[in-house]
């Protein structure tokens, strides 16, 4: 593939943008090489500025569940734009969005729109602290909840890729209020709550870890956390920025049958546009200003264009069989990847929940952060570049989940597996 135009753009970007990008993982620092620059996207494909086409398993990091540039979403955005971009005042679409979310996710009796997943998680933590009168929060090793100071303690995603467990610039006094647990460890959670449970305002978790690759919860683990939180008066917060409306119509909480106190959502409710939301029980949400004393605000929150895009997308994914079909195709992709690896003499394991999947270069079933970090990262990097050379774009980090959309049809999956049969041979080194 020719990448002359992308190389020229990256050279210019490095002079003006830190690392040449506006979000760290895009720089390919973990896998090596340089990123390609996207010109357009359609369906299951990205097209770069040099005219190369890629099957896309990043999906703008999750929200493109109906594929890129879907006609219904695009038309909804065009119609909204005809009436203006942002009002700084209430609009009908944000009410319809709230009605839709509360109907599809019953644990959210009320919601507040924000502009990103990070805003949603930061706001949820503030609400948990304000509602309980406590200061400590609990998160999990390898889980990423945005770039808020409270979360950059043993974080995942870009932080894990960079190998930095905590970020400079986070005050020690603040980071000391964040307690970190190993994911999927029943005993550690029990012990922590026995020692400090009555001081913990909230426990925030990705119900399926998507920022240390894709790690599902062990049987009964989420229920165990629910019981601990209930016993100690701690708010259970599900970060469904990745899993919401993707692993099931009602998110991971519907898939696993667990009811959190608060839930955060991200860009998927904007059809890929910048948006987020958090919601929960009415008595909690009523404590947010102006109904209550816990302050949170945003000029662009609930803006009509993002709401229109999100509503169009949410209507599409409510079609009968949508999620079951996506889950079946994701499982078929994972089975095909394992078979292709075995044929090449490469040891891999896969995970999948709904339309999320993970690929690990290890013989172990990966259930913990420690297992994820012990995988053969150089082998993944070789595999990544071999797939990219054949026009398949995986996340440029061994610590990120993959995503399918309804545009990933049988032909796309078979083309992916054909590329994988070649790429696994390159991964052997």
Curated annotation (Swiss-Prot):
Pathway: Porphyrin-containing compound metabolism; protoporphyrin-IX biosynthesis; 5-aminolevulinate from L-glutamyl-tRNA(Glu): step 2/2. GO terms for molecular function: glutamate-1-semialdehyde 2,1-aminomutase activity; pyridoxal phosphate binding; transaminase activity. Its main location: cytoplasm. It catalyses: (S)-4-amino-5-oxopentanoate = 5-aminolevulinate. It is found in: Cytoplasm. It holds the Pfam family Aminotran_3. Gene3D superfamilies: Aspartate Aminotransferase, domain 1, Type I PLP-dependent aspartate aminotransferase-like (Major domain). Keywords: Cytoplasm, Isomerase, Porphyrin biosynthesis, Pyridoxal phosphate. Its EC number is 5.4.3.8. GO terms for cellular component: cytoplasm. InterPro entries: 4pyrrol_synth_GluAld_NH2Trfase, Aminotrans_3, Aminotrans_3_PPA_site, PyrdxlP-dep_Trfase, PyrdxlP-dep_Trfase_major, PyrdxlP-dep_Trfase_small. Its cofactor is pyridoxal 5'-phosphate. The modification N6-(pyridoxal phosphate)lysine is found at residue 267. GO terms for biological process: protoporphyrinogen IX biosynthetic process. It is an enzyme of class 5 (isomerase). Homodimer. Belongs to the class-III pyridoxal-phosphate-dependent aminotransferase family. HemL subfamily. This is Glutamate-1-semialdehyde 2,1-aminomutase.
């Amino acid at each position: 593939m020719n990448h002359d135009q992308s190389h020229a753009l990256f050279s210019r970007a490095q002079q003006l943008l830190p690392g040449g990008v506006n979000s760290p993982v895009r720089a390919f620092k973990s896998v090596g090489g340089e990123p390609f620059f996207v010109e357009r996207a359609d369906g299951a494909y990205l097209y770069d500025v040099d005219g190369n086409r890629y099957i896309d398993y990043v999906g703008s990091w999750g929200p493109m569940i109906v594929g890129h540039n879907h006609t219904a979403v695009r038309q909804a955005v065009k119609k909204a734009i005809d009436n203006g971009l942002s009002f700084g005042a209430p609009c009908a679409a944000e009410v319809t969005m709230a009605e839709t979310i509360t109907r599809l996710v019953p644990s959210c009796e009320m919601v507040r729109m924000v502009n990103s997943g990070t805003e949603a998680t930061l706001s949820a933590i503030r609400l948990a602290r304000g509602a309980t009168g406590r200061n400590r929060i609990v998160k999990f090793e390898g889980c990423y909840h945005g770039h808020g100071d409270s979360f950059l303690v043993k974080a995942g995603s870009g932080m894990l890729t960079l190998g930095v467990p905590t970020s400079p610039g986070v005050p020690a006094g603040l980071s000391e209020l964040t307690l970190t647990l190993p994911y999927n460890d029943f005993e550690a959670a029990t012990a922590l709550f026995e020692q400090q449970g009555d001081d913990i305002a909230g426990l925030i978790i990705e119900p399926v870890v998507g920022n240390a690759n894709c790690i599902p919860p062990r049987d009964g683990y989420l229920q165990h956390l629910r019981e601990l939180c209930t016993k100690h008066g701690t708010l259970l917060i599900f970060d469904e920025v990745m899993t919401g409306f993707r692993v099931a119509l009602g998110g991971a909480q519907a898939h696993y049958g667990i009811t959190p106190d608060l839930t955060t959502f991200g860009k998927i409710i904007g059809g890929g546009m910048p948006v987020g939301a958090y919601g929960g029980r009415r008595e909690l949400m009523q404590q947010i200003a102006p109904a209550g004393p816990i302050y949170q605000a945003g000029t662009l929150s609930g803006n009509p264009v993002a709401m229109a895009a999100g509503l169009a997308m949410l209507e599409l994914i409510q079609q009968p069989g949508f999620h079951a079909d996506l889950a079946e195709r994701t499982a078929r992709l994972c089975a095909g990847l394992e078979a292709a690896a075995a044929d090449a003499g490469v040891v891999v394991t896969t995970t999948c929940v709904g339309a999320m999947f993970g690929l690990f270069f290890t013989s172990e079933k990966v259930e913990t952060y420690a297992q994820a970090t012990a995988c053969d990262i150089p082998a993944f990097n070789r595999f990544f570049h071999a797939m990219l050379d054949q026009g398949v774009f995986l996340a440029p980090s061994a610590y990120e989940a993959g995503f399918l959309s309804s545009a990933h049809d049988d032909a796309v999956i078979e083309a992916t597996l054909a590329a994988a049969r070649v790429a696994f041979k390159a991964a052997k080194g």
